[in-house]
Curated annotation (Swiss-Prot):
Belongs to the MtlR/FumE family. It comes from Shigella flexneri. GO terms for molecular function: fumarate hydratase activity. PANTHER family: FUMARASE E-RELATED. The lineage of its organism: Bacteria, Pseudomonadati, Pseudomonadota, Gammaproteobacteria, Enterobacterales. Its EC number is 4.2.1.2. This is Fumarase E.
Length: 169
C-alpha cells in the first residue's frame, strides 16, 4: 500500500465538490492511515508471526479492516490519544450518517456545523475555529454561503491532515 503524502491528501480532498464526496474521501483516507499505522502495534516482527497472524488480521477482509474495530484496538493499547480517537470516530460516524441520508446536507448546513464543533483538531485551533464561528454567525449582508462552505472544507481538510500526522508510527 502506497503511503499518502500530504499533497496527495490535499489534492484528493480539494477535488471533492460536495460534502458527501468529501466525507467519503476523508473516510477512505483516514482508513488508509489507520491501516498504515496498525503494523506498528505488533512488536515482534518474526516472519512466521507476521505471515500467519499479522497479515490475516490486517487483510481487507480481516477484522481490522473495519475502522471502528481498528480504532478501538489502537486506543485500548494506549497508542492513541483520546482526542484523536474521538476525532476519527466522529468522522466515521458522520460519514455513516451521511451515507444513510436520502438528501445530503452541504458544507454550510447546521448539521455540518454541529459536526465541526465537535472535532477537536478544529476546535483546538482557536484562530481557525473563531474565524469559522464569526463567519457562521455573521450578519447576512456579510455572510456568503459559498465563502463559508469553502472555509468549512478547508477546516475539515486541515482536520484530516492533522489526524494523519498523528497516525505516523
Amino acid at each position: 500500500m502506497a503511503t499518502l503524502t500530504e499533497d496527495d491528501v490535499l489534492e484528493q480532498l480539494d477535488a471533492q465538490d460536495n460534502l458527501f464526496s468529501f466525507m467519503k474521501t476523508a473516510h477512505s483516507i483516514l482508513l488508509q492511515g489507520i491501516r498504515q499505522f496498525l503494523p506498528s502495534l505488533f512488536v515482534d516482527n518474526d516472519e512466521e508471526i507476521v505471515e500467519y497472524a499479522v497479515k490475516p488480521l490486517l487483510a481487507q477482509s480481516g477484522p481490522l479492516d473495519d475502522i471502528d474495530v481498528a480504532l478501538r484496538l489502537i486506543y485500548a493499547l494506549g497508542k492513541m490519544d483520546k482526542w484523536l480517537y474521538a476525532d476519527i470516530t466522529h468522522f466515521s460516524q458522520y460519514w455513516h450518517y451521511l451515507n444513510e441520508q436520502d438528501e445530503t446536507p452541504g458544507f454550510a448546513d447546521d448539521i455540518t456545523w454541529d459536526f465541526i464543533s465537535n472535532v477537536n483538531s478544529i476546535t483546538r485551533n482557536a484562530t481557525l475555529y473563531d474565524a469559522l464561528k464569526a463567519m457562521k454567525f455573521a450578519d447576512f449582508a456579510v455572510w456568503s454561503e459559498a465563502r463559508f462552505s469553502g472555509m468549512v472544507k478547508t477546516a475539515l481538510t486541515l482536520a484530516v491532515t492533522t489526524t494523519l500526522k498523528e497516525l505516523t508510527p
